Amino acid sequence: MQNSPTTEQTKNIVAERIQELRQLIAHNNRLYYENIPPRREIHDYEYDELFKELQELESRFPEFQSADSPTQIVGGSVSEGFKKVQHSVPMLSIENKPVTKMLSEVRSIIKELKDDAISIDIVAEPKIDGLSCSIRYEKHQLVRAATRGDGLEGEDITVNVHSISEIPKILPLDAPEVIEIRGEVYMSNSDFKQYTAQQNKIGEKPPENPRNAAAGSLRQLDPSVTASRPLRFFAYAWGEISNSFAKSQWDALQTLRGWGFKVCDDIRLLYSSDELNSYFEEMQERRSELDFTIDGIVYKLNSLSLQERVGQTNRAPRWAAAQKFPPEKRETLLQNITISVGRSGALTPVAELLPVRLLGTTVSNATLHNQDEVECKDFRIDDTIVVQRAGDVIPQVVSVVIEKRLSGSIPFVFPSACPVCGSKAVREPREAVWKCTGGLTCPAQSLERLKHFVSRDAFNIDGLGEKNIELFYNKGLLASPVDIFRLEEILSPPLLWQQKPSEFKPLQEWDGWGELSANNLFRAIRTKQKITLYRFIYALGIPKVGEVTAKILADNYVSLDNWQSSMLKAAERESECYQHLISIDGIGSVVADEIVSFFAEAHNIQVLDSLKNYLSVEDFTKPAIISSNISGKIVVFTGELEKRSRKAAKIEAEKFGAKVATDVSRKTDIVIAGTDPGSKLRKAQELGIKILSEDEWEHLINEK
């Protein structure tokens, strides 16, 4: 019989798990709160489960509690593009837990208060899936609006909020002199449908869901963009007030409604556990009928005096709870498994489903990720499967209903050739993905690479989104990126003395186009004929060369001609050029081989040379370096930084002459450790490398 772990072993295991959870949650918090549109790498339901696990471990092992834990921090940091705003009263999040648990905790507190006369009634409201904000009024005038941010500090969105018609700009004279109204900015489902249609019409990729649409619209640096979007607002709380204006949550909401704010009509005042359960079930059933997205129910004690007596933690009020709906699941038929081809040649199995309604959306396909996923869950054509919308966003095929499987069904066999071009498919060791070897001769890869070429972080050409790329590609007008810059020549109306090919009508005569939209597209393309080197490198879509790697290459090679010449010489693995390439921090042999392979294709060289005839690719210019005591030092950042984003910290370090590396090695001079630093800190300790806290780093770079 195996011995059970010692107490010390158990603590070590728990400490590692807590660190792992904190890093995963903090990483997804950054993605969610600091991106436009917000995103996560895991679904909301999984995120909540991880968060609960971390809370439970910290509760059971209080010696591992930390003020820097995600369980003690609200939201995310402030975007660098907005002015910072301090919340006079913190915008706390509401803890995800069953209302029964909240009531049990409240009753325990009441018992300690020795006040048996206190009655408990609850205000229940739908949990709107939008973007929280706080709107401040002084002398009845709207003076400022801010996002939640990290709960203590948000983004100043005052100008953008002025364009939302459902937010009053002036309050009645009976309102307090100073009051902060808090609520949710959202986009209704019907407005989102129209907005999506508009985006598709102009060839732009629409946001994935109304929540992303609302968040992306509100956090625009150009207020005219926000004004053009159909945003709405529900009020449900308040922050700082100069004087009390209600005795209960319910009465306060009615007062807000009287002042001109929209308050959700589905809010209820409830008095018993049966009513609470019935309301939750009712709203879960009705959610697909509503014209706004909800992902659960928020419960609050109705009595404001009781709220005050019950109090709050540094993260969340004790008098409130948020209970999320579980993912909605449905059974449907797996009609087929098709293979999609990405720009890098990745072959992805896709489930073609008998259309099924999930939360008001018709789901007809879902990714099956890779061969291992298909084989592990044994998905077969004509199976009855369970599909869900986890996080109410991405459809997932969860499992097979084995008892409904037809006799004679056969396992799915992954293809050995690309379904589009017929080229051989290969799967590298330790890789989960099969890839087409056809390269740019594969039409599917060509199309996806064209989409990537004009994407936001590449050429970012207004009006030339995925839909229009597909349109021009299917018309035979686009085969390679250089064709984009020939569109005006081919599709503009001919001048009197010009002879032009007759097979293409002028773009302004196409369905859905006119003179203005055609000219706008041509103008947008012309404005992008000057581009920085790193964006050009990224736009080429070389496998494993993302935005960061593209910047590293631009920094090292400075000009397009120098980079191209060096990469051609690097085809010889023993050459000095190849050895230099693999020695660059952040590149390595795997990425280097992808770059060299790209330049080994004659077609790619032809495209590059043709693009040079249309483009001006700017040489990489290093920012002016300030002489300092860290000049020439190699530094590594690890963990979560509190005062600035990792990207901003890197830029600042480079400004002072330091070189920022991604991994710790014997060459590293300094490691700056934020919260939850992980393995890099341990390695630095083992190597005896100087370790600084974020504050110590600040002091070092500011020393004269």
From Swiss-Prot:
Keyword Transmembrane among record annotations: no
One GO CC annotation, please?
A: cytosol
Please name the Pfam families in this protein's record. BRCT, DNA_ligase_aden, DNA_ligase_OB, DNA_ligase_ZBD, HHH_2
Q: Where does NAD(+) bind?
A: 44-48, 93-94, 125, 148, 184, 300, 324
Kindly list the positions annotated as binding Zn(2+).
Answer: 418, 421, 436, 442
Report the EC code(s) recorded for this entry.
6.5.1.2
Q: Which InterPro entries match?
A: BRCT_dom, BRCT_dom_sf, DisA/LigA_HHH, DNA_ligase, DNA_ligase_CS, DNAligase_adenylation, DNAligase_N, NA-bd_OB-fold
Catalytic activity of the protein: NAD(+) + (deoxyribonucleotide)n-3'-hydroxyl + 5'-phospho-(deoxyribonucleotide)m = (deoxyribonucleotide)n+m + AMP + beta-nicotinamide D-nucleotide
User: What enzyme category does the UniProt record give?
Assistant: ligase
Q: What exactly does this protein do?
A: DNA ligase that catalyzes the formation of phosphodiester linkages between 5'-phosphoryl and 3'-hydroxyl groups in double-stranded DNA using NAD as a coenzyme and as the energy source for the reaction. It is essential for DNA replication and repair of damaged DNA.
> What's this protein's name?
DNA ligase
- In which organism is this protein found? Pelobacter propionicus (strain DSM 2379 / NBRC 103807 / OttBd1)
